[in-house]
Amino acid sequence: MNTVNKPFRKKDAMQLVTGQPVYMDDVIPQDCLIVKLLRSPHANAMVRTINTTVAKKVPGIEAIFTWEDVPQDAPRYTQAGQTFPEASPRDRLVIDRHVRFVGDVVAIVAGKDEKCVDKALKLIKVEYQVLEPVLDFHTAKDNPVLVHPEDNWEALCPVGADNKRNLCAHDECGSGDIDAVLAGCDVVIDHVYHTKACQQAMMETFRTYCSIDTYGRLNVLSSTQIVFHARRNIANALHIPTSMVRVAKPRIGGGFGAKQTAVSEVYPAFVTWKTKKPSKIIFSRVESQTASSPRHEMEMHVRLGATKDGIVKGIDLYTLSNTGAYGEHGPTTVGLSGHKSIPLYGKAEAFRFVSDVVYTNHMSAGAYRGYGATQGLFAVESAVNELAHKLNMDPFALRLKNTVQEGDVMPAYYGAVNTSCALDRCLVKVREMIDWEHKYPARDLGNGKVRAVGMGMAMQGSGISGMDVGSATLKLNDDGFYSLIIGAADMGTGCDTTLAQIAAEVLDCPLDNIAVFGADTDTSPYDSGSYASSTTYVTGKATEKCAMKLREQICKLGAELLGCPADAVEFDGKEVFESAAPETKKTLSEIAYASQFGHMVPLEATETHTSPLSPPPYMVGAAEVEVDTETGEVKVLEFDACVDCGTPINPNLTRVQAEGGLLQGIGMTLTENVTYDRKGCPEENSLFQYKIPTRIDIGKINVEFENSYESNGPFGAKSIGEVVINTPLPAISDAIYNAIGTRFYELPITPEQIAMAAAENHK
């Protein structure tokens, strides 16, 4: 292959590293209204009265909107970026009289500059009727205090939601008699695991610009992963036709799933639609930390049974998920906690997976890389590590006995067959990379410090099977270069580059001959968006099909110009020539000119793709840590990982994806945590308080690949974006156990907890 599986530099790399104006606030007109939000100081309250009289008199203030400007009995909407009909309940109004978390919107203020808007915000007088909040998600279900008592709450999909029980979703599934299987096992691991909410903490906060175009339509430029879903959400929130809304995105300064939720779009859209003036909102870091869409807090009760020789016979999982004040992504994230962990163990005779998603008066949760699989894998993989210890077996050897193989029907994976898998090779590779044989389980350095290793494995999906759609349009221009128009969003992942590589491979042209445009709801073909590890696998396949179709058109027109049958010509990327007489040829530019100026057929193709399968990528990771038993400090000295993502379209970008995801997983394991005070107020409102690790905090990160070939993906590719975050959680927690002899069932694992446990063990 000429371009696929080659380490090309990102197309936008030079512009980004040299600081060119490419992000939203760089490219929009600066003469626009500044929009800011007055937020609730209470976790649960009704706005009794709100007085904006003095605030409206501040010079420069254009408008102030409150709940009185929004019909409270109107149909509600969701901010979740999901294919219609959304699984997430429609439970929001633009401004609701009932505020449900500290940070919920009370008023929208728009003015000519930040100074006047900030002044007006301070002059708004609000009287609240403070209500008892639901702050403990363990007691939320069937609590007499309802987070959503309203009658216009609506669930479009049968996900087991019931707002009168504080239930955002409930589900049960299984196969076999799990209780009988566990009763017959030699060993049963039975524990409850708890993962906290954590923030995506992307460098570019939420931001949106809105204006009215010549035709009276609402134009939205937003840092979003989901232009088409955002368009629908905005139209639903404003109760206007979808045809009156256009959404486009500039370069995105990171998302990690946060921008799969339309967190900021509705507010300037509301202002612009009402005032007919352009406006923008840029979330502060405080707002992005305290009023955004963090990972769902989850608690997982795992019962895992095995024979004495290490064969896993059954897995019983109950997950309780905290969706917070609103239900964005609640019903779908919880599903992945089981459906992306249980299938790893293909020899299991029975499984049961039950889940509840509950409303509380915490910040609304959302999508974050890993999307529920991260939480479930921590629980299941930690249980497997404990099983290996109890059986005195090597954790790698135990997994090699149990892992799902290519051709297996995967348990808890909707009856799907494992169509491609190199998980066994990944296990062997990582064991060698970390030098497991010589380092496992631990080495006491004799100075209060212990070095130890631990491991875990993971899977994810490649798009949402049978639901999400990828599309691409390709057209040949008059001088022989191509325009690739997509609806997927490059949020720093490099998908513009990888999709161009796929097109260039099919069309036999240099990568620089592919110009990529998107995403824009008016000009791009429909695409569900960049989430669910779908872009390379789903939109990439659409791009491959589209390029094949355009190639056929080029050959057909070239043959027509040559006066011979289409099956008698070949195309080498530069010329169409007769197979039997290569000297008889037409250049690509000649064919393009004939198409455009010769009034012949347009050389343009559009293809759409959705896959009936979501083939899992796999990953194995191993960590070496150094634990100071006196202070509890943990240093990650080395993290080695091996990924099966099918064919890596761009190995360099794939490796960078893996390294970044591993760093996020390390942060979730050791430092990152969204906490609240006793009144429900978030406590980490800055990057000084919310501690995300940087590259210099971690030692060596080594990533290798063991490639399978996925016949349903473009050139054999599967996804890479999310699976990479999942292995640090079980690997590091197991390494800490091997160092001090205490298992931790809750994340993050803090130095205080480690030091106290180590001291207790040495009494």
Which functions belong to the PLM regions below?
Residues 1-162, 274:
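Flexible, low-hydrophobicity surface segments
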Residues 6, 12-15, 82-85, 161-208, ...:
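Glycine-rich loop/linker segments at domain edges
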Residues 67-68, 239-244, 274-279, 308, ...:
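C-terminal catalytic domains of large/alpha subunits in multi-subunit enzymes
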Residues 74-79, 120-123, 222, 231-233, ...:
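Short acidic, glycine/serine/threonine-rich loops at helix termini
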Residues 96-98, 241-249, 273-284, 288-291:
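Conserved catalytic cysteine-centered active-site region
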Residues 147-238, 403-481, 612, 683-704:
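Helix-loop-helix junctions that connect adjacent transmembrane helices in secondary transporters/permeases
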Residues 232, 253-276, 280-283, 495-503:
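Thiamine diphosphate
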Residues 462-524, 539:
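Catalytic phosphate/nucleotide-handling subdomain of diverse soluble enzymes
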